[in-house]
């Protein structure tokens, strides 16, 4: 499946619906819609769509937001925002 129709849908949202919102609501940079368009362009409909969905799910008050660009390469595991701290788990070769 080509990503072009999905990118057009995102651009339509940006032109028509987004300006009608009373205030900017995205906590990330680039915005979730721009991230979606970039992810679809870079990674195609399936992988780019997955990245876009994962980003929208993270755009909520429980996540601090910030700068989160589209990864250059599709991650093997779920994407984590760049610059986010690593988990608190100690290395496996050391006792906890």
From Swiss-Prot:
Cited function: Could be involved in insertion of integral membrane proteins into the membrane.
Compositionally biased residues, Pro residues: 82-96
Region Disordered, annotated ranges: 68-96
Top-level taxon: Bacteria
SMART domains, alphabetized: Haemolytic
Protein name: Putative membrane protein insertion efficiency factor
Coiled coil: none
Keyword Cell membrane tagged: yes
Taxonomic source organism: Deinococcus radiodurans (strain ATCC 13939 / DSM 20539 / JCM 16871 / CCUG 27074 / LMG 4051 / NBRC 15346 / NCIMB 9279 / VKM B-1422 / R1)
PANTHER family recorded: MEMBRANE PROTEIN INSERTION EFFICIENCY FACTOR-RELATED
